Amino acid sequence: MVLLAMGLVIYLATSKYGNIRLGEGKPEYSTLSWLFMFICAGLGSSTLYWGVAEWAYYYQTPGLNIAPRSQQALEFSVPYSFFHWGISAWATYTLASLIMAYHFHVRKNKGLSLSGIIAAITGVRPQGPWGKLVDLMFLIATVGALTISLVVTAATFTRGLSALTGLPDNFTVQAFVILLSGGIFCLSSWIGINNGLQRLSKMVGWGAFLLPLLVLIVGPTEFITNSIINAIGLTTQNFLQMSLFTDPLGDGSFTRNWTVFYWLWWISYTPGVAMFVTRVSRGRKIKEVIWGLILGSTVGCWFFFGVMESYAIHQFINGVINVPQVLETLGGETAVQQVLMSLPAGKLFLAAYLGVMIIFLASHMDAVAYTMAATSTRNLQEGDDPDRGLRLFWCVVITLIPLSILFTGASLETMKTTVVLTALPFLVILLVKVGGFIRWLKQDYADIPAHQVEHYLPQTPVEALEKTPVLPAGTVFKGDN
């Protein structure tokens, strides 16, 4: 499914359909702000954790039947991060986003919700039992996916805060961190996208760029650069094998625990990301959305992961920090803290990292709250936003539910299993949406010459009905008897 999504969006970007404009008028946001909001909507703050520590998991339990803890396992650890956070994942987001944006901005269908688009494609009533079930599944899956980001972020943040200030690393401090972040994104949600989320996303985007840039400058620059180039080469060379690796001669644990989990995690987020991308992409062309999401977001992820993981690997192979051992004995949060503290002016780097993390968490939860409020709003039209009170309600909900899960002490594996189970129905839903999208494109643009596509707006069924003349009663047509 992920490979099919990638193939389809690349075809759309390079064909005449790429020039279809999603709504009338000029884009509402600058390209940079637009890309930053993509990143905040599509990535959780736990990205900052995985961006430092994920390679160590792959080093200990690698894919492709590579020997654990070998030189080859170390060499493939960064490429696997690039693979899981790269083009395939963002292509899935892109496809779902294009379908929703076309439904809302081109076809002018009402309702920025999953049930709304399913209703437009299949004819089921969005307020009927099937429509309500679809929206309920979306809300449950979104909370489940968000929980992993929030719990991992809280644990990483409090471990780093403890190293900086001496505060205890316990549930009370973790709860305070979550509530603090909740307060920030509640305020941002109340202010609105233009003055709230847009500003937070800019702070996150610049912070997530400047932090690894400084690490690249003050760290082992040559090693990091060579590591990134090598990882890009290995990812490109082995992309198809990584995508289709099922481990038929082994137990399949790597594929199941990592690749399948990641694909389903991304898929569980697709409805929410699609709603948010639709909201901020009015006036953009289809190919702009495709290249912005696939290339812009992938390059951003690869730069952060490439620099931070390569620095951690350098510290490991030079005997400064045994990151895999720390990961096993003290946990990934401690491994992240020790890697950052090993930098020159390590405390400043750790403080900056934690600052970016808390703002990242707030901006991501703000975007999620917006999509959940949009799902709960009937007949939302182009240019409208969900009610502020409804947005605040969902802000509170997505703060308290993960907080309760954190209190129970659920393991990461348990949360990953929950994500997999709740995401499975969205595979079917995504296939239904893809079928409807292809049908719409054929109906609306198949006969339109390529040079006219950009300025052509198809007539919606509602517009066609409004333009149908209403004849007086008793009108007799020629040939009637």
UniProtKB/Swiss-Prot annotation:
Q: GO CC terms for this protein? A: plasma membrane
Organism encoding this protein: Escherichia coli (strain K12)
- Name of the gene encoding the protein in the UniProt record: yeaV
GO MF terms here are: transmembrane transporter activity
User: What parts of the sequence cross the membrane?
Assistant: 32-52, 82-102, 137-157, 173-193, 204-224, 258-278, 289-309, 348-368, 392-412, 418-438
Q: Please give the Pfam families that the UniProt record associates with this protein.
A: BCCT
Matching entries from InterPro entries are given as: BCCT_CS, BCCT_transptr
Q: What membrane topology does this protein have?
A: Multi-pass membrane protein
Protein's recorded name: Uncharacterized transporter YeaV
Q: What family, per the record?
A: Belongs to the BCCT transporter (TC 2.A.15) family.
Q: What does this protein do?
A: Probable transporter whose substrate is unknown. Is not involved in aerobic D-malate transport.
Q: What happens when the gene is disrupted?
A: Deletion of yeaV has no effect on the aerobic growth with D-malate as the sole carbon source.
Per UniProt, the keywords (alphabetical) are: Cell inner membrane, Cell membrane, Membrane, Transmembrane, Transmembrane helix, Transport
* PROSITE patterns linked: BCCT
Localization per record? Cell inner membrane
